[in-house]
Amino acid sequence: MQRMRNGSSATSPGIVQYTTEVLFLDLWLRPDLAPRDRSLVTVSALFASGQVAQITYHLNRAMDNALTQEQAGEVITHLAFYAGWPNAFSALPLVKDVFEKRPH
């Protein structure tokens, strides 16, 4: 989140404010979905919409929130059928990189 603040605050302070106050300090803290589930939904939405630039950050957060490598791999397989094979293959190098850089 600090990287987002540093890179965007001068360009669009409003987006930083809404991201911090509404997205992270409200939506992500609502009690009806666990952080792992919210992370899984977020990664799936990014994957399905082809927004691969954000996958690394959010997949790391999902794994911080207890998503395993095996589960992440299964999510990609499942989403390939619903969101398209090109999206799956676009995301695979990023997912592989996340897996390799995380402690085992």
How should these model regions be labeled?
Residues 46-49, 64:
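Short, solvent-exposed interaction modules
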Residues 58, 75-78:
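Short, hydrophobic/aromatic alpha-helical segments in well-folded domains
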Residues 77-80, 96:
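Short amphipathic alpha-helical surface patches that mediate protein-protein
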Residues 1-36, 60, 64, 88-104:
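Acidic, glycine/proline-rich low-complexity segments that act as flexible tails and inter-domain linkers
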Residues 53-70:
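Mid-chain, well-packed structural core segment of small domains
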Residues 80-86:
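C-terminal structural segments of small proteins and small subunits
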Residues 37-46, 75-76:
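Short, structured motif recognition centered on aromatic/hydrophobic residues
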Residues 49-57, 87-89:
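Short helix-capping/linker segments at secondary-structure and domain boundaries
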